Amino acid sequence: EDAKIDKLLGLTSGVIMIVGPTGSGKSSTMYTLVRELLSDRTNLITLEDPVEYHIKGATQVQINEKVGLTFASGLRSILRQDPDIIMIGELRDQETASIAVQASITGHLVVSTLHTNSSASTITRLEDMGIESYLIADSVIGVIAQRLVRRLCPFCKKPKQATRRSEEHTSELQSPACIS
């Protein structure tokens, strides 16, 4: 799995989406990925609402809709700065998604999050946002879907003998995910 992510991070253009439900750690994963990508020669610019973590060596832009700085307008401005990598806190609307896809096709690496429950639903969600399927196929280079596993209360949890079905299910969960 690490090798697949390393291969993905070795690409210089395309869209990498981190997806999952609210509170699943998408932002943490996104920050980890862009930190891995950052080097002295990399021009990394982020668009965030809000800026959650400081990234040394990156230019981070806070969205401020009161003064007209939206994800879409910020992304248009960022493209004039010739970034190598663009991190967008979340693809929320058609205009931002469309600009992000175009940026990736013209040689930029775009990393963003999207609220969907699976990798497959990411494609449907982008289509629902008005992105043509051929553009999705041309731009999306990877989708990382995740969700957090709940922790049991140490005082309330009770040991239970695993059934054959639960063991099979657990081994399926531990098999490598598809990242292509």
What residue spans do the PLM features occupy?
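Positively charged, low-complexity/disordered segments
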Residues: E168-S180
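Short, flexible helix-loop junctions that flank or precede catalytic/ligand sites
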Residues: E1-E167, S171
